[in-house]
Amino acid sequence: SDVYKRQDQKHSGGNIAVRREKIMNIIAAVDKNWAIGKNNELLVRIPMDQKFFRETTTGKVVVMGRKTLESFPNGLPLKNRTNIVLTHNPAYQVKDAIVVHSMEELHRELEKYDTNDVYVIGGQKIYEQLLDECDVAHITKIDYAYDADAYFPNLDEKPEWKITADSEEQTYFDLEFYFYKYERVQK
């Protein structure tokens, strides 16, 4: 589904050169303060955002930390995706997922895939560790400030990231939210 209704011209005047070396993707839903969670749970579940996440990542490779995996229903890997879980626990195993124990091991595993097909899906530590290796960020911004204990790096404060597409305003009950596509631009 193409949630982005307005692209490039509005945001960049068409003159931003986007980096295209290692195009790993990152995807997250954030509130006004770039918060992503509390007590290892999402802040809110918005069906349209979940649908966008599902459609964007199905058939792709998703990279996550152990806590993110354990926050899924029954702690099970996501269906119809290659799940890669990064944990420092050497004994950790999970059915239907690839478990790696270091960034080096993760990078060796990722060499098997087209980086266009790799989506970093959380949580906070994984986002922080892998943001610099991503060139595209799909961010759902919820116009509300939640009580939270986990955050995504604020891309609006990072000059190397620019919004290249956005959606019209979306609503879910009394919540307003938008889909934004950020891309890392060349210096």
Regions found by a protein language model. Name each.
Residues K22-K187:
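Enzymes that bind and transform nitrogen-containing heteroaromatic metabolites
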Residues Q7-I23:
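Short, Lys/Arg-enriched N-terminal segments with co-localized hydrophobic residues
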